[in-house]
Amino acid sequence: MADPSLNNPVVIQATRLDASILPRNVFSKSYLLYVIAQGTDVGAIAGKANEAGQGAYDAQVKNDEQDVELADHEARIKQLRIDVDDHESRITANTKAITALNVRVTTAEGEIASLQTNVSALDGRVTTAENNISALQADYVSKTATTSQSLASPLNVTTSYSVGGKKVLGARQTGWTAATGTANKGVFDADLTFAVSDTYTQSEIQAIANALITERRRTKALEDALRAHGLID
């Protein structure tokens, strides 16, 4: 803090010193001149002292002002250090967060690549399925369609065929011995009648025998048909 006493001027009690105030015929002229010169010197010294005191006071006032300014600067620097420390902490936290995000992004990129591979595989499977569906739509047998349907390939069933819920064709029957002789696939009159007299003539018996042969051949033809269709063996 500035010393206010430095601002107080030096007061010279004797403000005027010349030959008129000195006793006459006591001192020599040279001494009188010396005394007068001393008074002048004392005044000059007092002036310089006052200037020096004022300068010292002004310097102390300036120092006090600078001390206040330096204290403000120190406080601001301290706050800046606190802010910098806070920023460093936040930067460190952000760096860690960025590192974690990088890891997550890398993981996500790997998962995306895997998903892209899976999607490509699924695209291939979907394309194949679409082609299969198109093929099925162009060539399939419907359970609900009422129009005539056909198959180009053999059809295999485990038990039997039914029409209206009634069995019409079952599994092959085995144990049949194949008939021999000639099969009759020609004209066959199921209503043919025979004349029979009381004495059974030769011609009547021959007609019945011929009809029996025709029937047997017809039976052979039917058996051949059943075998051809795989119904008996």
UniProtKB/Swiss-Prot annotation:
Q: Where is this region: Interaction with tail hub protein gp10?
A: 2-60
User: In chain numbering, where does the motif Basic cluster fall?
Assistant: 216-220
What superkingdom does the record give?
Viruses
Repeat (Trimerization heptad repeat) positions are 61-67, 70-76, 77-83, 84-90, 91-97, 98-104, 105-111, 112-118, 119-125, 126-132, 133-139
Keywords of this entry: Coiled coil, Late protein, Pore-mediated penetration of viral genome into host cell, Repeat, Viral genome ejection through host cell envelope, Viral penetration into host cytoplasm, Viral short tail ejection system, Viral tail protein, Virion, Virus entry into host cell
Q: Region Inverted coiled coil: which residues?
A: 175-233
- Name where it mostly resides: virion
Could you mention a single GO BP entry for this protein? symbiont genome entry into host cell via pore formation in plasma membrane
Q: Name one GO cellular component term.
A: virus tail
According to the UniProt entry, the coiled-coil residues are 61-139
- Give compartment(s): Virion
Instruction: Describe the family membership recorded for this protein in Swiss-Prot or TrEMBL.
Output: Belongs to the Lederbergvirus tail needle protein family.
Q: Subunit structure of this entry?
A: Homotrimer. The trimer forms an elongated coiled-coil (240A x 25A). The N-terminal tip may exist in a pre-ejection extended conformation, which may fold into a trimer of hairpins only after ejection into the host. Interacts (via N-terminus) with the tail hub gp10. Interacts with the head-to-tail adapter protein gp4.
What is the stated purpose of this protein? Answer: Cell-perforating component and plug protein of the phage tail machine. Together with gp4 and gp10, gp26 is required for stabilization of the condensed DNA within the capsid by plugging the hole through which the DNA enters. Host cell membrane perforation allows viral DNA ejection. The needle penetrates the host outer membrane. The needle is released and the internal head protein gp7 is ejected to form an extra-cellular channel.
Instruction: Provide the domain comment.
Output: the N-terminus forms the domain that binds to the tail hub protein gp10 and plugs the portal vertex channel, the middle coiled-coil rod, and finally a C-terminus distal tip that is a tight trimer of alpha-helical hairpins.
What name appears for this protein in its UniProt entry? Tail needle protein gp26
* Originating species: Salmonella phage P22 (Bacteriophage P22)
